[in-house]
């Protein structure tokens, strides 16, 4: 069996240097890191994580907590890119990730509690932000390091790191662009749930619609196509009225995909009958017919920053490494808002 000493000998460095490379120590030169990793590949050497856990009392794993149904999350490009960004950063520093997903809060709490008590992870990243979140309170009570992807929702939240976009400003930018194309009425379609991202995007939408004296309505629905179909069917006559210029803005790309499917079935043409726009750019919005105007909120960058932030907390062995990191966004204008 190849040992760390074998790697060190062939690479011409000390075993402690090899160990630091495995742990992702940034004080080692890129040349040394590259050389050690090359030798590890040549010798087919893999670190014994179980032994390392016993010695260091660390698991070198980060727990990722997602609130929602497993299938929609697995198919959602936003979460895929956030998770990719987190994994990239963690892997560079010798950490892995362990994900737990559930739409049931009690099940999610049980799983997180088990991960804490069985010492399965060293810290957590919550991939959502919600008021009065019992999981967040559990992590505080158990003195577990964690950060949140999303905005602070209370005074106590400002004691912890949050990675977010300015969703109010992003929604204002998108709504303003749509209005500038000429509209009489606006519809904002959102999912049910008390999540901060939804509140902020609705707030930005309402602010700009009100400032421009545009009639608007907000529809709360589920991601289920049948429910969306019923809403759109009730609006069909109005959406087809050539004397009323209308636009639909949706909360995110997955909900938007269901809306586009329903509009197609109802023979409502985009952008002729109604303009459409959304948030969370991906291949779903880029290759849609027609391609959809959207706000790119840089999910991979969100994940990378989240990974860096939680590792920084672990490195300094203190939760009080507090940051509020705002990731930039970009408006991508496509045919769905070009009449």
What are these regions (language model features)?
Residues 121-127, 187-189, 219, 242-252, ...:
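Periplasmic-binding protein-like
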Residues 46-110, 206:
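Amphipathic helical "hinge" segments at domain boundaries
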Residues 232, 236-339:
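Flexible loop/turn connectors
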């Amino acid at each position: 069996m190849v040992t760390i000493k074998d790697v060190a000998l062939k690479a011409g460095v000390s075993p402690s240097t090899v160990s630091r490379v495995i742990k992702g120590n940034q004080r080692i030169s890129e040349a040394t890191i590259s050389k050690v990793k090359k030798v590890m590949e040549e010798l087919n050497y893999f670190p014994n994580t179980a032994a390392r856990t016993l010695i260091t009392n660390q698991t070198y794993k980060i727990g990722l907590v997602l609130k929602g149904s497993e299938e929609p999350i697995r198919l959602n490009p936003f979460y895929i890119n956030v998770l990719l960004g987190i994994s990239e950063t963690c892997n560079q520093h010798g950490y892995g990730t362990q994900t737990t997903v559930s739409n049931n809060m009690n099940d999610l709490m049980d799983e997180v509690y088990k991960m804490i008590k069985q010492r399965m992870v060293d810290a957590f990243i919550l991939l959502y932000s919600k008021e009065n979140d019992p999981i967040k309170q559990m992590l505080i009570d158990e003195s577990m390091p964690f950060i949140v992807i999303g905005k602070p929702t209370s005074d106590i939240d400002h004691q912890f790191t949050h990675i977010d976009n300015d969703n109010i400003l992003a929604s204002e930018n998108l709504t303003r662009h749509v209005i500038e194309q000429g509209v009489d009425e606006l519809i904002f379609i959102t999912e049910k749930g008390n999540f901060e991202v939804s509140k902020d995007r609705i707030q930005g939408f309402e602010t700009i619609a009100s400032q421009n004296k545009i009639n608007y309505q907000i529809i709360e629905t589920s991601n289920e196509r049948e429910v969306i179909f019923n809403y759109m069917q009730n609006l069909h006559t109005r959406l087809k009225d050539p004397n009323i210029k209308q636009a639909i803005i949706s909360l995110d790309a997955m909900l938007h995909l269901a809306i586009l499917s329903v509009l197609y079935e109802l023979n409502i043409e985009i952008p002729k009958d109604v303009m459409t726009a959304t948030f969370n750019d991906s291949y779903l919005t880029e290759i849609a017919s027609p391609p959809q105007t959207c706000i790119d909120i840089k999910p991979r960058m969100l994940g990378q920053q989240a990974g860096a932030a939680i590792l920084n907390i672990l490195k300094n062995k203190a939760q009080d490494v507090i940051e509020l990191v705002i990731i930039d966004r970009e408006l991508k204008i496509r045919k769905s808002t070009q009449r």
